[in-house]
Amino acid sequence: MTDYYDVNLKNARQKLLCENLNFYNYRGLVQDTKLLNEIYSLHKPNIVIHLAAQAGVRYSIENPISYVESNLIGTFHILEMARKYKPDHLLMASTSSVYGSNKDMPLHETQKCDTQLSFYAATKKSNEAMAHSYSHLYDIP
């Protein structure tokens, strides 16, 4: 869990989620395929919510490799797990940063978003493209 956003708030939310008997929490890296395979084979989830990411526009300028590892490679592994274990649904978070220099407000999903202004936004837009292609190629809802 990164400290880019308030860790106390994250822990409080996680505590609430853990009260649900159908919620399983693991700490690790989304790049850890051994851990991901253990989790998927043990629980066989029917819904996967992928929120893991290295966040932050400014930090992506200083440390772009962490965005490659977490956002690109990590998301690739989540998509591969979905291809292998076939959950009923895979939900992924993106960011408004993908809209880049778009001036039309309010933002909406049908707007063009091909002008990312940060490496963070570029990795998240890449995640969207990867997820779209996996959904099409491997019938992942």
Cite the ranges covered by each PLM segment.
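N-terminal Rossmann-like NAD(P)+-binding domain of SDR-like oxidoreductases, especially those catalyzing
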Residues: 1-141
